[in-house]
Amino acid sequence: MRKSKVLALLLCLISGYSCAQDSSVTITTQTGNTLGLTISGYQYKEPSLDVKIDAPLVGVDYAGTYAFGNDWFVKADARYVYGSAKYTGSGTQSNIPYSYYDLRGLVGYDFSFSKLGGFVLAPFTGIGYRYLFDNQGGPTSSGANSYNRSSNYVYLPIGVTHRMKVNDTHKLETVFEYDYLIQGTQVSHLSQAAPYLPDVTNQQFRGYGLRLSSMYQFSEWSVGPYVTYWNIQNSNAVTNVITVNGNNYRLTAYEPANNTIEAGIKVAYSF
């Protein structure tokens, strides 16, 4: 038994103390892939109209990272979320198919700090695109007709990842992010509510998003909470002339200020 221990020690010394290194988790950004599953609660509000949409959501996401070896890295991630929503406003409406996807390309840089136990700060930025489809067309409980709506955001993510060792095999990764809205495009299919109404496209130029997540990683698995928030201001106004019973009317439509919050739990596998 003693000879086996001596032999193992010699092998470690010959390999340049790699035995000790193998048991220690790496906190710098690494090349690899991650698949994730999320379960969350979602709420969308238009305060001025007292409109609210609530939904439990299930999502899947993928992230691919390439580290260049000189502290720079690039990352691409994609996320798809689906759920069944409830509308409260002009009456109520349930079991609304509700989904969105989010695509992003990012570039960042690792700053390593050996003091305070050792940690990495990795600021990043890039470009993001979010598409949401609200399949709400149909009558509400009050008899009012609702309509389908799609939402497009092009945004600039600016954030930082904080990564630290918990012990030799576990680490904690926390991400803080601010999303600057470059342009939002809202398409409202008003013709579903009434045949004399036109479909309307509105543009949004003022708004922002916030993201916070914290993932505890052990081996290839990680788990943790996340929160996403959007705050979007009034869109531009679009005016159309509509004809009802032979009479012409001017219809001005805009997308009201709104906010969205989603909070949930994520489980991920890295490979």
Predicted regions and their residues:
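Short glycine/proline- and aromatic-enriched beta-strand/turn motifs that initiate or cap beta-hairpins
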Residues: 21-90, 268-270
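Short loop/turn motifs that connect adjacent beta-strands in outer-membrane beta-barrel proteins
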Residues: 21-31, 66-74, 111-121, 165-172, ...
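Transmembrane beta-strands of outer-membrane beta-barrel pores
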Residues: 39-45, 78-86, 111, 127-133, ...
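Extracellular loop and loop/strand-boundary signature of outer-membrane beta-barrel proteins
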Residues: 43-52, 85-97, 139-149, 188-204, ...
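Outer-membrane pore/translocation modules
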Residues: 83-159, 252
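Detector for outer-membrane/organellar transmembrane beta-barrel domains
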Residues: 129-201
